[in-house]
């Protein structure tokens, strides 16, 4: 019931702004490296915020603490590898690590076929993607653990076409050597780093502090160049022209978060925390035309912005009985471009009909302060153009009402069926000739 920009996708708690390869044909997530996933189609608790649709937090494997091991997989279009093991003995610190990587190789296969057919010099397959992830855990002592997590993934499209022509006219004694080159470089992807400190303050209180950087960049660079030299009799000369077009969108997201979990009251699990998120947006377009003695530079699009979101949340899970549980919470938010504070109440209920079957209800309000500038009628979404919510636009929000049932099978498979109602306000969409158009409902 939501658009892609209204859903928060995370890896180890870090926001992933472009969670797919090749427009969604391939997932960003390497399934071999996944430990578990926390998914909420709606009605998610107060500890999550920033989106008004759904939440998916993919948690990577911790790594094997006992022995070194690995596996590799080869398919028709890609290869992937995963290795993991305990920290080296010389570190004198218990812990584990995991490294996983993946790359498509149909570009290499197709190029090899083209070379064998004699066409490889003129034509090459232009696209591939790759990604890798690293996770390191260090148990400094029984009460303190540090976790470093990194993800790096790119889609790459490269096109290179060049030619070299010679012309000679014996009657006019004219000779010309002409070279032309056309090149497209188009990388886009996500790069993330995070460091998490978990502190077991006492048996009833756990603190978690998290610092992360998530960077998404899309960069389309096209260059066309022609140059040459000529001779007619005793006269000689040179020439050269170049045209370049550069289109880019860069998001730099820095997040600081702390969370406390307290189990000091019977039948209650209390959580509270704060989050500071600073996001820099840079959307731009540049043209350049040059010849031997003149350069013309145009910059028709240059949108730079910085926003800061500050959030406080608290939630309590109350086990009223062996069959009934409530989850009540709220999230208070400040958006740097707006003067007012926003409060999102959250409520959840779970009733156990029997040991393997439960009924769930969730209600809540959810605010969002960023959007995308993609056309509504876009059929294939390869990349997204993210923008912060302008100061003159009201905050977007949605009210959720979710009712569902869950069934846990004997093999620990969880089946869920839900019906939902989501009411959206102040939506912003891109229309022909306008950057932003507000939809009130």
Please state what every model-predicted region is:
Residues 43, 60, 74-78, 87, ...:
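Transmembrane beta-strands of outer-membrane beta-barrel pores
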Residues 60, 74, 85-87, 138-140, ...:
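Residue-level signature of outer-membrane beta-barrel architecture
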Residues 137-156, 183-338, 413-416:
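Face-selective signature of the C-terminal outer-membrane beta-barrel domain
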Residues 54, 68-70, 77-81, 130-134, ...:
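Hydrophobic, lipid-facing positions within transmembrane beta-strands of outer-membrane proteins
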Residues 14-40:
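Short acidic/polar hinge/loop motifs at secondary-structure boundaries
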Residues 178-197, 301-305, 366-424, 434-435, ...:
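Outer-membrane beta-barrel signature, preferentially recognizing the C-terminal barrel domain
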Residues 4, 34, 65, 77, ...:
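Outer-membrane beta-barrel channels and translocator barrels
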Residues 8, 36-45, 53-61, 68-139, ...:
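Predominantly transmembrane beta-strands of Gram-negative outer membrane beta-barrel pores used
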